[in-house]
Amino acid sequence: MNQTELQQHMEEVSLQFFQKEFRHQAVFNTRLRTTGGRYLLKSHNIEMNPKYLENFGLEYFFGIMKHELCHYHLHLEKKGYQHRDKDFRELLKKVDAPRFCAAIPREITMHEYTCKSCGKSFLRQRRFNVNRYRCGSCGGRLKQTGSKKVYTESP
């Protein structure tokens, strides 16, 4: 999906679920990390995170669009548009939009080190110089035995 398709989908979702036009810009923002989308109060534009489209699919992405459009339409109507407001929660239920997003799994490289004396192994996220450090249990020399990718749930 590109920017023009995003704009078109945003306008269609707005008309279908809210019966109101979306008159501002919808753009992808790849710098968003922990949120699915963002409604900008000053410009009334909506920024969407393309990673949610890649990881969770189009149906989930439309849910995020509906959530951001709830902020958009309530703000323009001068009603409560924040997450804690009653108007916002009621509109979310009416259009069946999620209140919060699921976290995108992150890929982390874990480095494995093993003691040459006692054989104890441990994982670290950061690499370190094995010549400068020793085993905490026995004081033996360390060697890097490998690295592996781990996926985490939290951002």
UniProtKB/Swiss-Prot annotation:
User: What's an example GO cellular component term for this entry?
Assistant: cytoplasm
The residues covered by the SprT-like domain are 7-145
Which is one Pfam family of this protein? Zn_ribbon_SprT
Give the GO biological process terms.
response to stress
State the free-text cofactor note: Binds 1 zinc ion.
Residues of the active site: 68
Compartments it resides in: Cytoplasm
Q: Where does Zn(2+) bind?
A: 67, 71
Q: Which UniProt keywords apply?
A: Cytoplasm, Metal-binding, Zinc
Database matches in InterPro entries: SprT-like_domain, SprT_Zn_ribbon, Uncharacterised_SprT-like
Q: Coiled coil located at which positions?
A: none
- Which Gene Ontology terms cover its molecular function? zinc ion binding
Q: What is its main location?
A: cytoplasm
Cofactors that this protein relies on: Zn(2+)
Tell me which family the UniProt entry assigns to this protein. Belongs to the SprT family.
Q: What is this protein called?
A: Protein SprT-like
